Regions:
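Long, hydrophobic, well-ordered secondary-structure blocks that form the structural core
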Residues: 68-80
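Short secondary-structure boundary/capping segments
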Residues: 83-86, 189
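Short, conserved acidic/polar surface loops in the N-terminal third of protein domains
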Residues: 53-56, 78-84
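Catalytic cores of soluble, metal-dependent hydrolases
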Residues: 1-67, 90-99, 103-264
């Protein structure tokens, strides 16, 4: 690779305005409550690029820091040894190209190690991970660069996570669409063989009038959605769930000039 030539491209990108990483779609909507303010929305193909949107959200210096509530089929927290202070302390998160390159090249390419780095940089107060499996890891902690401790709590029960969420903190909602997939027992756990949950179950979770989303909605300040088609049983399944999410959350206005949350 011609490093000097590539460096020239990075310092002089073609186009106007900022450039988001490939495979990422940026959207803005008013807050679900209708209050003044903006809800930043990021749609990513690979889950680690959600870090890009979490970083941009953190620039707003919201006080108190929101909780990260992540719905996932896998544990994407990562391990302490893979939090590299030298990388993170020197990351210029206001430089979108540098930030995008960091997500691409320095976060785990398996897309399972982006939450601890976010806590190290104090993007969130704590992380609450809702998994779609019977078994769950033990709760953990992560110190940030200022020495403050952040808690990582795991759940596999929606009612329990709703009960445990601190009522006074805003929420950044992160949804990996493979949360709505299940293992195909006839396919020997091959990636791409997953089956989707039934439509009524998916809709009941995502409905803004449903028992899960309704108590959360007024607290949401940001949203990331990871398509992860390889873990959803293919692109068709992933886009099918995205279509349901778009309808239930945004009344089919996602990625249009009139994107807005569905009225309850």
């Amino acid at each position: 690779m011609d490093v000097a030539r590539v460096s020239g491209w990075l310092n002089n990108p073609v186009g106007q305005g900022w450039i988001d990483p490939p495979g990422c779609e940026t959207e803005y909507a008013s807050l679900p409550t209708g209050d003044k303010g903006c809800c930043n929305i990021g749609i990513v193909s690979e889950h680690r690029f959600a870090f890009y949107y979490w970083a941009l959200q953190s620039i707003e210096a919201r006080t108190p820091r929101p909780i990260l509530l992540s719905l996932d089929s896998h544990d994407d927290v990562g391990v302490p040894d893979e939090v590299v202070p030298d990388d993170l302390d020197n990351l210029r998160i206001r430089d979108r190209i540098e930030l995008g390159l960091f997500c691409w090249l320095r976060l785990r390419s398996l897309n399972d190690g982006h939450i601890r780095p976010a806590l190290y940089l104090n993007f969130f107060s704590d992380a609450y991970i809702l998994l779609n499996k019977d078994e769950k890891p033990s709760d953990e902690q992560q110190r940030d660069r200022a020495g403050l401790t952040h808690t990582i709590k795991y759940y596999n029960d929606m009612d329990r996570v709703l009960k445990d969420l601190p009522p006074h903190l805003p929420i950044f909602l992160d949804i990996d669409l493979d949360f709505f997939a299940k293992e195909n027992s006839n396919a020997e756990s091959r990636h791409g063989s997953e089956l989707l949950k039934e439509n009524p179950e998916i809709k009941s979770i995502l409905s803004l009038k449903g028992p899960f989303m309704m108590p959360l909605l007024h607290r949401i300040v940001g949203l990331t959605v990871a398509l992860e088609p390889k873990y959803c049983g293919g692109l068709r399944n992933s886009l099918h769930v995205l279509e349901i999410l778009n309808h239930e959350f945004f009344n089919d206005t996602l990625c249009t000039d009139s994107c807005k949350w569905r009225k309850r």
